[in-house]
A protein has these predicted regions:
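Active-site rim elements
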Residues: 49-53, 138-145, 166-167
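Acidic/aromatic/glycine-rich contiguous surface patches that form carbohydrate-binding/processing clefts
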Residues: 85-87, 146-184
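Substrate-binding surface in catalytic domains of secreted glycosidases
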Residues: 1-110
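Hydrophobic, secondary-structure "cap" segments at the distal end of domains
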Residues: 103-161
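Flexible, active-site-adjacent loop/turn segments at secondary-structure boundaries
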Residues: 27, 43-44, 81, 114, ...
Length: 184
């Protein structure tokens, strides 16, 4: 069952469908990515308040849409990414956020740690409203989740009474740092 961020057709029978399923996984990742015009957060917990040049969507807005559509809280699972996106060729404005880019690719959490986070060329920042970290340096913007943001999302799922959380993709977190944060 899809969530249409652009407000187009969305299945209107979620409450009927929900009686036949054990759970529905809300894949609250890839909310933004290389298909967009601007570098943005892959999976913001909440919608940033500043002006974004593209559509506004977040984990919270997606969960609320599913609940409004009739999926019971106890059947809804919140998906958390164990990967991020590297946007190259961004301008040094707003630390790369909402800037156009020349190329982009997905990269797993382990690769973000070894290839970017521990390099002095990149500065780690955290967006207070979106609740997620990002890196900026060398005209590169990197959107990802870390242990703190994964923990916040898991706490959000519990506070909302959701069935639980799920991850994509476990092999991107071989040290289980994110998995432990999700469980804790």
């Amino acid at each position: 069952m899809g969530y249409n961020r652009n407000g187009g057709y969305v299945c209107q029978r979620h409450s009927k469908v929900s009686q036949y399923i054990d759970y529905a996984l809300d894949m609250t990742y890839d909310l933004h990515g290389p298909w967009d015009t601007y570098a943005d957060f892959n999976s913001p917990l909440y919608t940033p308040t500043e002006s974004s040049p593209q559509y506004k969507i977040s984990v919270d807005s997606s969960i609320r849409a599913w609940l409004s559509a009739g999926i019971p809280k106890g059947k809804l699972v919140l998906g958390i990414p164990f990967y991020g996106y590297v946007y190259n060729g961004v301008k040094n404005t707003n630390n790369g956020l909402y800037q156009t880019f020349t190329s982009a690719k997905a990269v797993g959490y382990d690769s973000i740690i070894s290839n970017y986070l521990n390099k002095s060329a990149y500065t780690k920042l955290t967006h207070s409203t979106a609740g997620v970290p990002y890196l900026f340096g060398n005209n590169t913007f990197i959107s990802y989740d870390d242990a703190a943001s994964v923990k916040k999302k898991a706490q959000y799922a519990r506070s909302q009474g959701l069935r639980g959380t799920a991850a994509w993709e476990l092999s991107y977190d071989r040290s289980a740092v994110l998995l432990k944060a999700m469980a804790g």
